[in-house]
UniProtKB/Swiss-Prot annotation:
Lineage: Eukaryota, Metazoa, Chordata, Craniata, Vertebrata
Ranges of the Extracellular topological domain: 29-687
Protein name as annotated: Protocadherin gamma-B1
Compositionally skewed regions (Polar residues) per UniProt: 799-836
Native species: Homo sapiens (Human)
Annotated spans, Disordered: 797-836, 897-927
């Protein structure tokens, strides 16, 4: 099959040049593509038809084809050049750096020939491969470290970066591996002996050789190295002399040749290779050097006749095996003047306090020169400008003393170089340097980095957050320079200081212990202290001013109009003839924040009649924008929003109820129709009062029943007479009541305020024209209780005793409307306020029920002659003036008696109750 394909390619190679010669005029420009090798069959190489300028529709008629059909073909559907066979760069181009397939593309009708070049890029698809499965080596155990062995290289078909890069072996203690490059560029491994082999210990070694290429990821190949250790050595080395003698001047330069020792071995090869070494002589190895291969001995140090005048060296010669030989080398040293002075410290103080006095001895120094005569006379001095000096005490003795003031903060250490010079020619000298450490004393107080600190902290900060950091430095050392921080004083209360801030003693970080509130605390100042740990301790103080920044955390609060329990504003009255610009009222609000956060603006959110009123953006003034029209309602409602200038802004709302009226009488019906908001606190008080009233009624009924039973047993009483002032009984059948009827003359005045929606009674005054009742009858079956006092009596209709009228719903009071004590009343009041809460609430119920009847015009206690009048006032406070003691004349809720007058009952009018069904006034009905 392969041969047939090759024959076909040969035929194509012959045919296409022939065609090219025929149609050379039709050859177009060259087209070039680049692809990686080993692309899968069917992979697109390029858009051949498009690059040739051919459309896909004409491909079937043009019969587009390529000459390299073993590798490529043309798709007639898309016109793409596709891979038709395996493209192996290594097989096609071998190790050429550039690999390209060149072929021709032929199109017919008309005939055109195009030259196409496909460059094949190398990929790392070939791992390094060793030809041999293993490598065998034989190494004698006498082989010296450093011996190299070249090994067979591996083969990698890839090129350039994907080719073979390096060799490695598994770690071991005897061998290492390096990679070498041959002149042709190929790389081969070299095995290096790192440690002598011992056949008796290990006769063979097995290594794994790995070859790695430079691809990403890299590919590798391995093979085994088998090393066999051989042993053959039967002759010992022999020195030419047993003792070698030589003379040498002292102070000769290093590396000076002394002599050469020589030994021979009759063996051949590796067994005849001899190495030399000093034998158990530390002095020899420190002053002399022996070449292990040649036997040359050279100087390796300074030879001093004054120290040693003669050296004896023992030398050992060893062949490649285990045989050795020994000889001695005697070296005589010739004396010269070669000794420099020596400086020795007899005593030395390394730590010097910085407050030491002048003249304090720091060190005692001894100088010595091994030479004699002038060469042995020595002088000493210091080299640098230091606050120390040398003073001679005796021959060859000096002392180092303090010659200037010491300051550790400026210079903590001194390097003092002492030079000793003899008087020889040429003079020899020596230098000795010592380091003197200046010890610290606590002579510096901490210094803050700033004269004062000012920090800005936003309110509502998280507790525990750091708000500032103070920093102080102390140039002293150790505890003398270790600074701790504390709060010394503050303009806050001492009890509150720890609850506001704290400071870290180590870092000086000031922490907020609580969330600050700009509205409560806008700024405060702390006095912080930095204190070192010296003895005595030194300290410094600094002020820290904390400015608490404002956040928009407070919504505006509406002061006027005052809000009712349901959050709505109260009524304001506007004249019907009010001109445009008439000031109706003013919304007053405050914001606890500051700055822009407290800059308030007023906006109308909702209006019953848009355009009727205008609202001042900054003033909050409500003015009429136009005159009241005929179609405008008399009652108007404005929903006003008050916004601050914060980001984001906060707001509050207020509701204004406005009534257009020219007189107070027009306002009352509107106020009566207004449902009162439910107050949970008022309802609770109402329930308590009702419960107390029921208990009291039950108790009174029990007392009355007991008295009635006792009276029935008494036979001495007249059945038709009254046995008490206010209590009568009859045993006969019911007789129409025979009593006088009358009215109690009272007058009432109504006052209305724009901020109140309740009818509150200012005073209850008894007119002097009150006529006393003529007589009082008590019906026995109904057991009506008639309450009376010494001066006045109120008659009750016994026919209505079984139909109790409910109290008006207005009788309950809020906490702000509770009647005050006598301290808030006039001192000349003739009446007495009830002295307990129960009586007080009963009186309040009676007054409010009467006020409700007076407000809607249906009250039986009218304002005419001979009637009881009430004075009511609308306002935020409820006060009673000139209230006589009516506790004996007042109806108690829960009883069968109803507060009324005879005229009201004759007319068939029911008293005003709590059901809220009140009649409108006459003026209201006309409307």
């Amino acid at each position: 099959m392969q041969r047939a394909r090759e024959a076909e390619m040969m035929k194509s190679q012959v045919l296409f040049p022939f065609l090219l010669s025929l149609f050379c005029g039709a050859i177009s420009q060259q087209i070039r593509y680049t692809i990686p090798e080993e692309l899968a069959n069917g992979s697109r190489v390029g858009k051949l038809a498009k690059d040739l300028g051919l459309s896909v529709r004409e491909l079937p008629t043009r019969k587009l084809r390529v000459s390299a059909e073993d590798y490529f073909n043309v798709s007639l559907e898309s016109g793409d050049l596709l891979v038709n066979g395996r493209i192996d760069r290594e097989k096609i181009c071998g190790r050429k750096l550039e690999c390209a397939l060149e072929f021709e593309t032929v199109a017919e009708n008309p005939m055109n020939v195009f030259h196409v070049v496909v460059v094949i890029q190398d990929i790392n698809d070939n791992a390094p491969r060793f030809v041999a499965k293993g490598i065998d080596l034989e190494i004698c155990e006498s082989a010296l470290p450093g011996v190299k062995f070249s090994l067979d290289s591996a083969q990698d078909a890839d090129v350039e970066g994907n080719s073979l890069k390096l060799y490695t072996i598994n770690p071991n203690q005897y061998f290492s591996l390096s990679t070498k490059e041959s002149p042709d560029g190929s790389k081969y491994p070299v095995l290096l002996l790192e440690k002598p082999l011992d056949r008796e210990h290990q006769s063979s070694h097995r290594l794994i050789l790995t070859a790695m290429d430079g691809g990403d990821p890299p590919l590798s190949g391995t093979t085994h190295i088998w090393i066999r250790v051989t042993d053959a050595n039967d002759n010992a080395p022999v020195f030419s002399q047993e003792v070698y003698r030589v003379s040498l001047q002292e102070n000769v330069p290093w590396g000076t040749s002394v002599l050469r020792v020589m030994a021979t071995d009759q063996d051949e090869g590796i067994n005849a290779e001899i190495t030399y070494a000093f034998l158990n002589s530390p002095i020899s190895t420190s002053l002399f050097n022996l070449n292990p291969n040649t036997g040359d001995i050279t100087t390796n140090g300074t030879l001093d006749f004054e120290e040693t005048s003669r050296y004896v060296l023992s030398v050992e010669a060893k062949d490649g095996g285990v045989h050795t030989a020994h000889c001695n080398v005697q070296i005589e040293i010739v004396d010269e003047n070669d000794n420099a002075p020596e400086v020795t410290f007899m005593s030395f103080s390394n730590q010097i306090p910085e407050d030491s006095d002048l003249g304090t001895v720091i060190a005692l120094i001894k100088v010595r020169d091994k030479d004699s005569g002038q060469n042995g006379m020595v002088t000493c001095y210091t080299q640098e400008e230091v606050p120390f000096k040398l003073e001679s005490t005796s021959k060859n003795y000096y002392k180092l003393v303090i010659a200037g003031a010491l300051n550790r903060e400026q210079t903590a250490d001194y390097n003092v170089t002492i030079i000793a010079t003899d008087k020889g020619k040429p003079a020899l000298s020596s230098r000795t340097s010592i380091t003197l450490h200046i010890s610290d004393i606590n002579d510096n107080a901490p210094v803050f980095h700033q004269a004062s600190y000012v920090v800005h902290v936003s309110e509502n900060n998280p507790p525990g957050a750091s708000i500032a950091q103070v920093s102080a430095s102390d140039p002293d050392l150790g505890p003398n320079g270790r600074v701790s921080y504390s709060i010394l004083a503050s303009d806050l209360e001492p009890r509150e200081l720890l609850s506001y801030v704290s400071v870290s003693p180590q870092s000086g970080v000031v922490f907020a212990q609580r969330a600050f509130d700009h509205e409560q605390l806008r700024a405060f100042e702390l006095t912080l202290q930095a204190r070192d740990q010296g003895s005595p301790a030194l300290s410094a103080n600094v002020s820290l001013r904390v400015l608490v920044g404002d956040l928009n955390d407070n919504a505006p609060r509406v002061l006027y109009p005052a809000l009712g329990p349901d959050g709505s504003a109260l009524f304001d009255m506007v004249p019907r003839a009010a001109e445009p610009g008439y000031l109706v009222t003013k919304v007053v609000a405050v914001d606890a924040d500051s700055g822009h956060n407290a800059w308030l603006s007023y906006h109308v959110l909702q209006a019953s009649e848009p355009g009727l009123f205008s609202l001042g953006l900054r003033t909050g003034e409500v003015r009429t924008a136009r005159a009241l029209g005929d179609r405008d309602a008399a009652r108007q409602r404005l929903l006003v929003a008050v916004r601050d200038g914060g980001q984001p802004p906060l707001s509050a709302t207020a509701t204004l109820h406005l009534i257009f009226a020219d007189s107070l009488q027009e306002v009352l019906p509107d106020l009566s129709d207004r449902p009162e908001p439910s107050d949970p606190q008022t309802e609770l008080q109402f329930y308590l009062v009702v419960a107390l009233a029921l208990i009291s009624v039950l108790f009174l009924l029990a007392v009355i029943l007991a008295i009635a039973l006792r009276l029935r047993r008494s036979s001495s009483l007249d059945t038709e007479g009254c046995f008490q002032t206010g209590l009568c009984s009859k045993s006969g059948p019911g007789v129409p009541p025979n009593h006088s009827e009358g009215t109690l003359p009272y007058s009432y005045n109504l006052c209305i305020a724009s901020h109140s929606a309740k009818t509150e009674f200012n005073s209850l005054n008894l007119t002097p024209e009150m006529a006393p009742p003529q007589d009082l009858l008590c019906d026995d079956p109904s057991m009506v209780v008639c309450a009376s006092n010494e001066d006045h009596k109120i008659a009750y209709d016994p026919s209505l005793s079984s139909h109790q009228a409910p109290p008006n719903t207005d009788w309950r009071f809020s906490q702000a409307q509770r009647p005050g004590t006598s301290g808030s009343q006039n001192g000349d009041d003739t009446g007495t306020w009830p002295n307990n809460q129960f009586d007080t609430e009963m009186l309040q119920a009676m007054i409010l029920a009467s006020a409700s009847e007076a407000a809607d015009g249906s009250s039986t206690l009218g304002g005419g002659a001979g009637t009881m009048g009430l004075s009511a006032r609308y306002g935020p406070q409820f006060t009673l003036q000139h209230v006589p003691d009516y506790r004996q004349n007042v109806y108690i809720p829960g009883s069968n008696a109803t507060l009324t007058n005879a005229a009201g009952k004759r007319d068939g009018k029911a008293p005003a109750g709590g059901n809220g069904n009140k009649k409108k006034s006459g003026k209201k009905e006309k409307k």
